[in-house]
Amino acid sequence: VCDVDRKHREQAKRAVDDRYKNNNCKAYLDFRELIGRGDLDAVQLALPDHWHALPVIEAARAGLDMHGQKPFARSIKEGRAMCDAIHRYGRVWQTGSQQRSDYNFYHAARLVRNGRIGKIQKIEVGLPTGGSHGPAKEMPVPENLDWEFWLGPAPWRPYCDFGRGNCHWEWRWIMDYSGGQLTDWAGHHIDIAHWGMGWDTTGPVEIEGQGTYPESGLYDTPYEFKFTCKYKNGIVMTVANNKKIPQGTKWYGDKGWIYVKRGQLTADPMDVLKEEIGPGEIHLHRSRDHKQDFLDAIKTRQLPVAPAEVGFRSISVGLLGEIAMLTGRRIRWNPDTEEIANDPGASALLGRSYREPWTL
């Protein structure tokens, strides 16, 4: 186990030792020491977004398979570098977009994919609404935390109360580390929208929208947002926080609609939900348990239900929406070359500057 917080390290070690009734679990502060052991098959990564890229690339080079949390990456250039490393070294990757292993989401996506509501006219995706907070209160670094390592490639800043407690949760609302609810949930509901449309390896061509950002204080990610994504076939997907669009994914076809969120699947007409997919139709990967699907893929060397390219393309939509809102401009995106046309300012936001000594 590995963590920059000693309390977390010790807690994780105890959990493993208790499970195996011994004291053999090794605990590390530096992920490079764990990855470099030479006797591992796979690793599970649950890190702040700004720390997603470097450990993944390092683990791929070391020949390890990986289960990693969404969002896949904090920037598009990081995501592409991660995908390239995973593919180059032939590693299995499962993104933690566990809704793909939930029957309701799977069933909704396969019905849409097989034309049960006709030709798709538009898509709506609702994500959670964010929040704001007052000024940060600078504090001494907890003695159990390696703050320098926690920051890693992100810009340096003094340790603070993070608004509500410590750094292990509230980092999500600070752009140096995350994109707020938008990027936190893009890997869930945008991911399902893509699955139903067969867009797992592509993306939109035009993105524009607006976000509402805190005027002051520690948090600087948008707490409200709405943007549209136009795809090559002309279909427009609208993504917004749940005060504007109900949370979940909704496809509108010329023969009806299907809406799915956690704990709910509905449609008009309702009878469409009773339909099955025939032998000659499109069959999506059926996973009944997300982590078991990953373990099975390690053994078979087949793609799991949420492989690297899928995770990358899903978060790319959220990241492009972020860029469109930050610049206030319509973004013209080429999903094949992964370039923004005729906008150097927007293009600069495709990557992130790394603090020394870290490099991508």
Q: Which residue stretches match the model-derived regions?
A:
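N-terminal glycine-/serine-/threonine-rich beta1-alpha1-beta2 phosphate-ribose binding loop
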Residues: 1-68, 74-92
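Non-transmembrane alpha-helical segments in soluble domains
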Residues: 13, 32-35, 44, 56-60, ...
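Conserved beta-strand->loop/alpha-helix structural units within folded catalytic cores of enzymes
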Residues: 45-49, 64, 68-69, 94-98, ...
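NAD(P)-dependent dehydrogenases' Rossmann-like dinucleotide-binding region
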Residues: 116-134, 146-160, 205-214, 238-241
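C-terminal helical cap and adjacent loop that interface with cofactors, partners, or active-site loops
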Residues: 177-201, 216, 224-226, 245-360
